[in-house]
UniProtKB/Swiss-Prot annotation:
Its EC number is 4.6.1.2. The keyword Endoplasmic reticulum applies. It is found in: Cell membrane; Endoplasmic reticulum membrane. Coiled coil: none annotated. This is Guanylyl cyclase C. SMART domains: CYCc. GO terms for molecular function: ATP binding; GTP binding; guanylate cyclase activity; peptide receptor activity; protein kinase activity; toxic substance binding. The keyword Nucleus does not apply. Residues 23-429 are extracellular. Homotrimer. Interacts via its C-terminal region with PDZK2. Interacts with the lectin chaperone VIP36. The lineage of its organism: Eukaryota, Metazoa, Chordata, Craniata, Vertebrata. It holds the Pfam family ANF_receptor. Residues 488-748 form the Protein kinase domain. Glycans are attached at N31, N74, N78, N187, N194, N306, N401.
Length: 1072
């Protein structure tokens, strides 16, 4: 006990140092220098001289350097050897090596000797503790660490066969029943383990002894022999229960345990001796005491199994030294792979890459499985009575988990060239055998009859139960007045997603929810039917009622009671409707916890027994603020998933339990107390990381959410302590829900007694607070509604005329209307296709955006309506939808002069010096207008006036305002004195020849109009414009100006907003 306490104190002292590694471990693993940190511990799994191990690593480094040079990678690869000399804790063997390993780690941290990979230790105890406590994404290569506790470690690679591989071989060999030498499947065995075995044998036998191991699960009988006397008694005894004994060691070990006793002919001893090569030497002769022994060992490299294994060449070095060399070559292989791919070797990806691969070892390819453990070919040897040599009986490929029989007619000691059955013979007691056989047959027949009767009664009960299937015609959709409701949470996507997942309907005049039973086709198994019947029988105040199942379309739904206020998670999130000052005070929080505890207490005592999916989203609130548990039962239909509410033991193993429900209750309690996100903690925000840390947290301080105990008063502290007891790491330390229910009742009494008021006083006070909160809520949401209405109106006014919007709001329709006289403006950019030819698409978009934003500002200063933009065409009308007498021609004319004046100053950013010419055409006359379409409606103009205005623009000239005679006639009727010139007769398609005019200005008002180009011939005009573009491009290249896209943010600095970007009137305290 004292030594264990010292070890625990030592580990706690080491923890701060080990956690400091994060900034030190990569000191020698970058900038072309890569080192291996090799732990040289005297207590290794084999008593191999440390110098041999160092020589093996150096030899491996020479091979790695050569391979890197051949790959043309100019890097430096070295090794740092860390010895245990001078350590405070220096152990004598592997079983006390934990502190020695941690001391070495501390020395590496202090001296910054850590390289890219840590090689060693080989002892299971030290390896497991180093992996567990470092908490680093750091690769470890071990020549040993055989125990099951080192299996499936993400950053640990083992170069020698672990106990798991041996266990799988024995299980598969026990199952063999169709080989020439083995016709019986074995189901029993003895295991000899006296505790003084070497490191490898200790862990191999420990794996076979473990009751939860794969080997123990498949055997019907297994017993462990711990003393040589027991071994000898079983070896010779007639009352033994198995003919097979498994032990580990050398032939000498077997002889020392057996002594001079003669072994019975039907005894089979499996001797595990993986790392001895003398069985393959020519001069090796098997002693007679090995006749009943099958030896399991590893053959030399490039060994091909056959009837005789003599004449092979065993390796000059031990398997342990070879493992250090192979580990060095593995590091070189991974380093070369990452460097050739341009990836860093200091990332978690590198630490987890030492698995599921094949690399070139010293004598051939070496394969690692997806857990980072080496795969080998194991051989099972027998003694040939003819030659007294060891021969191969069968081989086993650990990579494929495949047995390969080799011998067809082995000449071993057992009869008929076959291994005996594992069960000893019963002798000539034929009568007794017959009696037992007959009795067994009678018992089996009776059991079959009972089972058939039981099944018939159960099926009859299931048929009589009215659980079954609710006809789809009994499920009715909700009425319109039941589904329509006003909600100001316009952007609440989560509510919309929830409505899509669940369906609200009516069943038996009650509002219900249809829950989708995924992966279910309606053909329920017997187990599922029993679960559904249990759900029907569950009826409690704090549980939602289950009514049955229904099939809609091709999907199966569960019909469940509906609760109006939604899930508890939604209530906690809604701080407006349920503020802390009224509903969510401490009394109410304890009441909510008590409701959950009552529901779970009833559930655990019912036939359902366990929930398995308890979380805040599976706790719903009805209209009376009563919390009810839902989504329970049907675990065979809806298996539980890993999430933040799942207990750590169920994260590690996908099961459910009542204690796991208690843990889930504690996470919900933390949500209720703090009203923050699920599993709230300041140290971590990522959900997947939280689940990982809970699943892999061990020791005295597991990972849990935050509870701010320092700010809690005495009564609140009682609640916190209850929550902490519910999320204990040990499930047995957690209270049950009966205890939780009684504790909450006491705590509620403490809160209530302090205020010296009756329950009625408390109820009246809470109702008054709630009433005031509702008044404030209505006022606030009214303001929010008005602000949103104004935003919608403003958006509509930017899309349609104000009168049209008003008509749509009041009547729902817009009647088309005929206007006797309006003026329409058309303009386009001269040479637009030529400009596009010399510009990128984004430059064209930015050019049009800059021009038309300026046009829009000019339009805002006149009584006109912008109809649309089509490419480079800009269309404006006046006199509609509101008639303005003769002002329509005046406003269009003034607007056209303003636009032409602006174009005289406009310059393209990507084509400096190039003038932008536009043609403007104006015409007046009658037209019809109305809203066309339902989706994206537009206010459109129709009539010959529109076509004529377009013709006026197309027949005009650059930087000219081309006006028809009808427009000039209207201008003459006004008091405004416009200046214009007669152009002469112009041919207009569809109208013939008409007299048209150039608008040149306005008397008593100066316009800075650009000078139109003097070229009259259209062909010469196009040539001149193309020359201007070429000149602008040359100018841009000469000045080094690069085209750039103007940022949209720049428009805000000019005092106006971009398209459709309205001022945001949202409040942080709402979902608006």
């Amino acid at each position: 006990m004292t030594s264990l306490l010292g070890l625990a104190v030592r580990l706690l002292l080491f923890q701060p140092t080990l956690m400091f590694w994060a900034s030190q471990v990569r000191q020698k693993c970058h900038n072309g220098t890569y080192e291996i940190s090799v732990l040289m511990m005297d207590n290794s799994a084999y008593k191999e001289p440390l110098q041999n191990l160092r020589d093996a690593v150096e030899e491996g480094l020479d091979i790695v350097r050569k391979r890197l040079r051949e790959a043309e990678l100019n890097v430096t690869v070295n090794a740092t050897f860390i010895y245990s000399d001078g350590l405070i804790h220096k152990s004598g063997d592997c079983r006390s090596s934990t502190c020695e390993g941690l001391d070495l780690l501390r020395e590496i941290t202090r001296d910054r000797k850590m390289g890219c990979v840590l090689m060693g230790p080989s002892c299971t105890y030290s390896t497991f503790q180093m992996y567990l406590d470092t908490e680093l994404n750091y690769p470890m290569i071990s020549a040993g660490s055989f125990g099951l506790s080192c299996d499936y470690k993400e950053t640990l690679t083992r170069i020698l066969p672990p106990a798991r591989k041996l266990m799988y071989f024995l299980v598969d060999f026990w199952k063999v029943n169709n080989a020439p030498f083995k016709t019986f499947s074995w189901n029993s065995s003895y295991v000899y383990k006296n505790g003084s075995e070497p490191e490898d044998c200790f862990w191999y036998l420990n794996a076979l002894e473990a009751g939860v191991s794969y080997f123990s699960e498949v055997l019907s009988f297994k017993d462990v022999l711990r003393r040589s006397e027991q071994f000898q008694e079983i070896l010779m005894g007639r009352n033994r229960k198995s003919n097979v004994i498994v032990m580990c060691g050398t032939p000498e070990t077997f002889y020392n345990v057996k002594g001079d006793l003669k072994v019975a002919d039907d005894t089979v001893v499996i001797l595990v001796d993986l790392f001895s090569n003398h069985y393959f030497e020519d001069d090796t002769r098997a002693p007679e005491y090995m006749d009943n022994v099958l030896v399991l060992t590893l053959p030399p490299e490039k060994f091909i199994a056959n009837a005789s294994v003599s004449g092979r060449f065993p390796s000059e070095r031990s398997d342990f030294s070879l493992a250090y060399l192979e580990g060095t070559l593995l590091f070189g292989h991974m380093l070369q792979t990452f460097l050739e791919n341009g990836e860093s070797v200091t990332t978690p990806k590198f630490a987890r890459a030492f698995r599921n691969l094949t690399f070139q070892g010293l004598e051939g390819p070496v394969t690692l499985d997806d857990s980072g453990d080496i795969d080998n070919i194991m051989c099972l040897l027998y003694v040939s009575l003819d030659t007294r040599k060891y021969k191969v009986l069968m081989a086993y490929d650990t990579h494929k988990n495949q047995t390969i029989p080799v011998a067809t007619s082995p000449n071993f000691i057992w009869k008929n060239h076959r291994l005996p059955n594992d069960v000893p013979g019963l002798g000539p007691q034929i009568l007794m055998i017959a009696v037992f056989t007959l009795t067994g047959i009678v018992v089996v027949l009776l059991l079959i009859a009972l089972l058939v009767l039981r099944k018939y009664r159960r099926d009859h009960e299931l048929r009589q139960k009215k659980w079954s299937h609710i006809p789809s015609e009994n499920i009715f959709p909700l009425e319109t007045n039941e589904t329509n409701h006003v909600s100001l949470k316009i952007d609440d996507d989560r509510r919309r997603d929830t409505i899509q997942r669940v369906r609200q309907c009516k069943y038996d005049k009650k509002k219900v929810i249809l829950k989708d039973l995924k992966h279910c086709d309606g053909n329920f198994s017997e187990k599922q039917k029993i679960e559904l019947n249990k759900l029907l029988q569950s009826d409690y105040y704090n549980l939602t009622k289950f009514y049955g199942t229904v099939k809609l379309d091709t999907r199966i739904f569960g019909v469940v009671e509906y609760c109006e206020r939604g899930s508890l998670r939604e209530v906690l999130n809604d701080t407006i409707s349920y503020p802390d000052g009224t509903f969510m005070d401490w009394e109410f929080k304890i009441s909510v916890l008590n409701d959950i505890a009552k529901g779970m207490s009833y559930l655990h005592s019912s036939k359902i027994e366990v929930h398995g999916r308890l979380k805040s989203t599976n706790c719903v609130v009805d209209s009376r603020m009563v919390v009810k548990i839902t989504d329970f039962g049907c675990n065979s239909i809806l298996p539980p998933k890993k999430d933040l509410w799942t207990a750590p033991e169920h994260l590690r193993q996908a099961t459910i339990s009542q204690k796991g429900d208690v843990y889930s209750f504690s996470i919900i309690a933390q949500e209720i107390i703090l009203r923050k996100e699920t599993f709230y903690t300041l140290s971590c925000r990522d959900q997947n990381e939280k689940i990982f840390r809970v699943e892999n947290s061990y020791g005295t301080k597991p990972f849990r959410p935050d509870l701010f105990l320092e700010t809690a008063d005495e009564k609140e502290l009682e609640v916190y302590l209850l929550v902490k007891s519910c999320w204990e790491e040990d499930p047995e330390k957690r209270p049950d829900f009966k205890k939780i229910e009684s504790t909450l009742a006491k705590i509620f009494g403490l809160f209530h007694d302090q205020k010296n008021e009756s329950y009625m006083d408390t109820l009246i006070r809470r109702l008054q607070l709630y009433s005031r909160n509702l008044e404030h809520l209505v006022e606030e949401r009214t303001q929010l509604y008005k602000a949103e209405r104004d935003r919608a109106d403003h958006l509509n006014f930017m899309l349609l005329p104000r009168l049209v919007v008003k008509s749509l709001k009041e009547k729902g329709i817009v009647e088309p209307e005929l206007y006797e006289e309006v003026t329409i403006y058309f303009s386009d950019i001269v040479g637009f296709t030529t400009i596009c030819k010399y510009s990128t698409p984004m430059e064209v978009v930015d050019m049009l955006n800059d021009i038309y934003k300026s046009f829009d500002q000019i339009v805002d200063h006149h009584d006109v309506y912008k109809v649309e933009t089509i490419g480079d065409a800009y269309v404006v009308a006046s006199g509609l939808p509101m008639r303005n007498g003769n002002r329509h021609a005046v406003d269009i004319s003034k607007m056209a002069l303003d636009i032409l004046s602006f174009m005289g100053t406009f310059e393209l950013e990507h084509l400096p010096g190039l003038p932008v010419w536009i043609r403007i055409g104006v015409h007046s006359g009658p037209c019809a207008a109305g809203v066309v379409g339902i989706k994206m409606p537009r206010y459109c103009l129709f009539g010959d006036t529109v076509n004529t205005a377009s013709r006026m623009e197309s027949t005009g000239l650059p930087l000219r305002i081309h006006m028809s005679s009808s427009t000039i006639a209207i201008l003459r009727r006004t008091d405004c004195q416009f200046l214009y010139e007669v152009r002469g007769e112009t041919y207009l398609k569809g109208r013939g020849t008409e007299t048209t005019y150039w608008l040149t200005g306005m008397k008593d008002q100066e316009y800075n109009l650009p000078t139109p180009p003097t070229v009259e011939n259209q062909q010469r005009l196009q040539t001149e414009f193309s020359d201007m573009i070429v000149s602008a491009l040359q100018k841009r290249q000469a000045s080094g100006v690069k085209s750039r896209r103007p940022t949209r943010v720049a428009s805000y600095k000019k005092g106006f907003l971009e398209y459709m970007q309205l001022n945001n009137s949202d409040h942080d305290s709402t979902y608006f």
